[in-house]
């Protein structure tokens, strides 16, 4: 609205408006509300609860004790509020998206059914299942009683384990505050660590409080020398694995007792049940309509880039775009929360607030009362979430967790990594909010795309063909202070960003991918993106071992010794003007684990050779010489590897899913199936890494070293085999004698590079068509001759020409005409456009022009010194022409100033820099001297290099740095030689493989053959 009916009760108080509550609120109100254009805030304290203006009406944001605030009341008015539950126990079908672990103490007995009270005396674990009811889509919280936390211990002879456990609890300060129920029973289990372990007696120690597990386990290990097993398994995983449940999917409860009072959650419906009441419906992969929210914030930076702990750096607007997963992409509800009045925005619900505090309460309650399950945004983990939570906690003393989906014991936090200060956008920050699946689309795009930068505008253009209207943060204060119309423009920009992010979520369908990984890995969805791959494989291994009565020991220091990682066949650097065939091992590391039956349970370590008794070398077991000695692994017919069994079952399942996918016509079901097979692929590829991470959940570096040893051996065997093949051998691979035209009898195969799981084969003397003809047959023949299933070599791609620089760095043109670059930056991203474009021209010429390619091949096969004695091949002169023309363009002023600009971020105040001898700081100081507008912190300062005064040679960069606008306005000549040297250095880095793979040698050749015309 335009502001006619909006008033700020905290600047013009109306004492009779509301009943005074007990609480006093701090509000920071922009001065521009009183004086248009004014900066700063007014500090106001008072008892009025948070308020909101919407469609000419004033409403209280919060609600009663049941949490029914403005958003809930709005739903009730629209008729979309959900019905209450029945008042008696009845069957319940519901879908689960999150699983929480909570603890009840005996004080809760009065509010739970009498038959459940025994589970929580003196305390007990209550698993909360959050999801949606099948009947009507209402949000539900199901409290599940009866789950236990436990671990196993192998005790020395004569130790009274129960007494030792009780002693540990007595010594715990935590247990004195919260008494814990304990039970100890003898069970028969087998340790997964090492082949030949017989079933034996172990003590299963069950505790009613999960926080006691770690203390008791450590006590038994350190004080009594017990070997501990599975003390790092939480109650949530026990709940899922012990009962063969799912972390995302449909459940049925045969007797769900509604909780009508004293609820734990703000879900629309809440129930109590026992573990035994539940069952899962795995066959149903459908989804209910979950609510997804994309949000974005706009902030006020009083002194440059906004800082959350500065009182005046307010959050001005929060855009919220809502989408139901059951709807088509694009059918969004758009909401804008804004400080002050705002003109109407078409298609957007605009809610106006008198202060930031009121708006923050509304935002948190929107997530809660509109039953949001998935929250996304762009770089929200690094900026938006920390900013909102810091403002809430440090400025207003709001506890965001208290406004979440759980009334008590919830979590709402941002965990910044230790290196978070190294750079904006560079750190992987974790967001943990109870009952929400946080998905940062910035991190998703970084993982799935390869772009020059990952700004939202760049990504939106690339994926969606959408142009993002940008507002620089310097414009935000002016627009906001301009009044309702300025806030409308700012709001349009803010809502647009959230809508684009929701489009990206739907483009990648990342929420489905997360759910499928969660299901296969037995972990909650919220742990998929942030907790890495270790937990996925650990949970799967735990499940497989549990079915066979095996248990997993806790890792010890001896498990963490180092080993030699994967190596490569050193590249023969140079330019190859003949076809280069690349063959890959399909799923190399998983296939090695399967082929050689590698596992914790099949391994016999040095010193344990007595376990080999009765086994035949080569037939019953294989031996590998590793860093720590000779290790043996028994073969599948003796004992099947758990890791190999997991991989085999996953890959079989993936194959079946891909078969279903090929026949499926329903778009939604196709998406789910596709994400299922991708989830399996991702988890399979994580198995090797799981064993090789020294500080992981269950490391076994001897397995990881065996895998890499076999990988190296396979590469070397394949190299020798391929290089021994003659044209006649290749001709014999034809499907029939007349299927192929005769191959060139002078042709020769040579492996020029081997990279972990692939070989680069130079097909010298063979044409492109000949190479493509025998590529698949060559890979299949090598596989049959050298390897056992499931190891398989496949022809992946063929280059028509290739610049091989160093390991993991090459540029080539594929046979379909596309250029492929790996590990190569043409020039540094910080280079100016002039250098970038000219270097690209050089590369394109070398890869595309037939005469230049021939000359490049000649140069790369002779010592670089011959270029000085014999000169450059004639075919290479067009490259020199490009460089000479660039110099002429510079000297004659034909290069636009914009192409010569560099830029560096002003990361902190000038006084905070240890040294100011940097070009961008030199320009900053010139701004000060000229009394010009100064850049703010986080601004990028542009600069060019100009000729030093008096033409002094060897001047420092800081003396040559100048503001581009000033240089252009005053006709200051640019430093021609400096820019040309930058160009030659960039070109030399690209062309180094032509000159003994030495960038210094390449630079000296280019300097020698480029002509710098006299002034």
From Swiss-Prot:
Main localization, broad class: host cell
Xref: SUPFAM superfamilies: DNA/RNA polymerases, Ribonuclease H-like
Record InterPro entries: DNA-dir_DNA_pol_B, DNA-dir_DNA_pol_B_CS, DNA-dir_DNA_pol_B_exonuc, DNA-dir_DNA_pol_B_multi_dom, DNA/RNA_pol_sf, DNA_pol_B_thumb, DNA_pol_palm_dom_sf, DNA_pol_type-B
Annotated S-S bridges: none
Catalytic activity entry: DNA(n) + a 2'-deoxyribonucleoside 5'-triphosphate = DNA(n+1) + diphosphate
GO molecular function (one): 3'-5'-DNA exonuclease activity
EC number: 2.7.7.7
GO BP term, pick one: bidirectional double-stranded viral DNA replication
Alphabetical keyword list: DNA replication, DNA-binding, DNA-directed DNA polymerase, Early protein, Host nucleus, Nucleotidyltransferase, Transferase, Viral DNA replication
GO annotations of cellular component type: host cell nucleus
Matching SMART domains: POLBc
Pfam families: DNA_pol_B (PF00136), DNA_pol_B_exo1 (PF03104)
Cellular location(s): Host nucleus
Family assignment from sequence similarity: Belongs to the DNA polymerase type-B family.
Function (record text): Replicates viral genomic DNA in the late phase of lytic infection, producing long concatemeric DNA. The replication complex is composed of six viral proteins: the DNA polymerase, processivity factor, primase, primase-associated factor, helicase, and ssDNA-binding protein.
Subunit: Forms a complex with the ssDNA-binding protein BALF2, the DNA polymerase processivity factor BMRF1, and the alkaline exonuclease BGLF5. Interacts with the putative helicase-primase complex composed of BBLF4, BSLF1 and BBLF2/3 proteins; these interactions may coordinate leading and lagging strand DNA synthesis at the replication fork.
The name this protein goes by in its record: DNA polymerase catalytic subunit
């Amino acid at each position: 609205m335009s502001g006619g009916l909006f008033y700020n009760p905290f600047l013009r108080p109306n004492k009779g408006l509301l009943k005074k509550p007990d609480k006093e609120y701090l509000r920071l109100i922009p001065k521009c509300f009183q004086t248009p254009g004014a900066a700063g805030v007014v500090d106001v304290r008072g008892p009025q609860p948070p308020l909101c203006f919407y469609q000419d009406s004033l409403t209280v944001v919060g609600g009663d004790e049941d949490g029914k605030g403005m958003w809930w009341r709005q739903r009730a008015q629209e008729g979309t509020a959900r019905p209450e539950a029945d008042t008696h126990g009845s069957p319940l079908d519901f879908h689960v998206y999150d699983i929480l672990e909570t603890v009840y103490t005996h004080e809760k007995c009065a509010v739970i059914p009498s038959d459940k009270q025994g589970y929580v005396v003196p305390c007990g674990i209550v698993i909360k299942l959050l999801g949606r009811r099948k009947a009507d889509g209402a949000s539900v919280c199901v409290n599940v009683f009866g789950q236990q936390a436990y671990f196993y211990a192998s005790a020395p002879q004569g130790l009274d384990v129960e007494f030792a456990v009780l002693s540990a609890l007595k010594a715990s300060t935590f247990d004195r505050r919260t008494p814990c129920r304990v039970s100890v029973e003898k069970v028969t289990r087998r340790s997964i660590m090492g082949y030949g372990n017989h079933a034996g007696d172990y003590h299963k120690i069950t505790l009613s409080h999960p926080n006691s597990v770690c203390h008791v386990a450590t006590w038994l290990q350190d004080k009594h020398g017990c070997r501990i097993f599975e003390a790092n398994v939480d109650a949530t995983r026990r709940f899922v694995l012990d009962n063969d449940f799912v972390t995302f999917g449909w459940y049925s409860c045969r007797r769900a007792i509604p909780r009508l009072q004293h609820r734990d959650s703000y879900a629309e419906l809440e129930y109590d049940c026992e573990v035994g009441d539940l069952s899962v419906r795995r066959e149903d992969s459908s989804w209910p309509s979950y609510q997804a929210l994309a949000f974005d914030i706009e902030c006020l930076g009083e002194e440059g880039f906004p800082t959350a702990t500065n009182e005046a750096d307010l959050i001005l607007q929060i855009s919220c775009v809502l989408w139901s997963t059951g709807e088509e992409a694009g059918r969004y509800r758009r909401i804008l929360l804004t400080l002050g009045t705002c003109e109407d925005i078409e298609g957007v619900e605009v809610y106006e607030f008198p202060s930031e505090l009121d708006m923050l309460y509304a935002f948190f309650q929107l997530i809660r009362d509109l039953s949001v399950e998935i929250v996304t945004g762009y770089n929200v983990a690094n900026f938006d979430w920390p900013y909102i939570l810091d403002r809430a906690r440090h400025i207003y003393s709001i506890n965001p967790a208290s406004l979440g989906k759980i009334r008590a014991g919830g979590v709402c936090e941002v965990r910044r990594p230790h290196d978070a200060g190294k750079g904006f956008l560079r750190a992987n920050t974790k967001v943990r909010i109870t009952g929400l699946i946080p998905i940062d689309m910035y991190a998703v795009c970084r993982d799935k795309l390869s772009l020059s930068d990952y700004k939202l505008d760049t990504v939106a253009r690339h994926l969606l063909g959408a142009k993002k209207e940008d507002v620089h943060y310097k414009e935000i204060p002016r627009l906001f202070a301009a009044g309702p119309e300025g806030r409308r423009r700012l709001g349009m920009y803010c809502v647009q960003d959230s809508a684009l992010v929701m489009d990206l979520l739907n483009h990648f369908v990342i929420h489905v991918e997360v759910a499928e990984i969660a299901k296969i890995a037995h972990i909650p969805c919220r742990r998929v993106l942030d907790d890495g791959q270790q937990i996925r494989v650990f949970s799967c291994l735990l499940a497989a071992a549990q079915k066979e009565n095996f248990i997993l020991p806790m890792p010890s220091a001896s498990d963490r010794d180092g080993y030699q990682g994967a190596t490569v066949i050193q590249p023969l650097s140079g330019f190859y003007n003949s076809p280069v065939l690349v063959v890959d091992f399909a799923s190399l590391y998983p296939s090695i684990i399967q082929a050689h039956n590698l596992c914790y349970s099949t391994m016999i370590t040095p010193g344990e050779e007595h376990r080999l008794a009765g086994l035949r070398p080569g037939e019953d077991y294989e031996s590998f010489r590793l860093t720590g000695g000779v290790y043996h692994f028994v073969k599948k017919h003796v004992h099947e590897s758990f890791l190999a069994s997991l991989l085999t079952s996953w890959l079989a399942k993936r194959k079946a899913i891909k078969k279903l996918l090929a026949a499926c016509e329903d778009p939604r079901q196709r998406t789910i199936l596709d994400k299922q097979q991708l989830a399996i692929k991702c988890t399979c590829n994580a198995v090797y890494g799981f064993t090789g991470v020294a500080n992981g959940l269950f490391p076994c570096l001897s397995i990881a070293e065996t895998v890499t040893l076999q990988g190296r051996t396979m590469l070397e065997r394949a190299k020798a085999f391929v290089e021994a093949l003659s044209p006649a051998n290749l001709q014999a691979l034809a499907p029939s004698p007349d299927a192929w035209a005769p191959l060139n009898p002078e042709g020769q195969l040579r492996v020029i590079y081997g990279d972990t799981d692939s070989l680069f084969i130079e097909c010298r003397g063979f044409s492109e068509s000949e190479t493509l003809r025998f590529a698949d047959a060559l890979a299949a023949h090598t596989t049959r001759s050298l390897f056992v299933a499931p190891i398989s070599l496949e022809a992946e791609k063929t280059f028509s020409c290739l610049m091989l620089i160093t390991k993991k760095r090459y540029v080539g043109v594929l046979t379909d005409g596309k250029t492929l670059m790996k590990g190569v930056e043409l020039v540094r991203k910080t280079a100016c456009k002039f250098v970038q474009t000219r270097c690209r021209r050089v590369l394109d010429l070398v890869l595309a022009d037939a005469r230049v390619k021939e000359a490049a091949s000649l140069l790369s096969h002779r010592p670089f010194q011959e270029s000085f004695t014999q000169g450059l091949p004639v075919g290479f002169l067009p490259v020199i022409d490009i460089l000479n023309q660039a110099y002429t363009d510079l000297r004659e002023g034909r290069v636009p100033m914009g192409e010569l600009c560099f830029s560096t971020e002003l990361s902190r105040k000038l006084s905070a820099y240890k040294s100011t001898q940097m070009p961008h700081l030199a320009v900053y100081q010139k701004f000060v001297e000229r009394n010009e507008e100064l850049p703010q912190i986080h601004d990028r300062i542009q600069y060019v290099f100009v000729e030093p005064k008096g033409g002094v040679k060897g001047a420092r960069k800081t003396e040559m740095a100048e503001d581009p606008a000033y240089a252009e306005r005053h006709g200051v000549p640019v430093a021609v030689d400096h820019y040309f040297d930058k160009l030659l250095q960039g070109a030399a880095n690209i062309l180094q493989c032509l000159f003994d793979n030495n960038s210094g040698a390449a630079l000296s050749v280019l300097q020698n053959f480029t002509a710098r015309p006299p002034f």
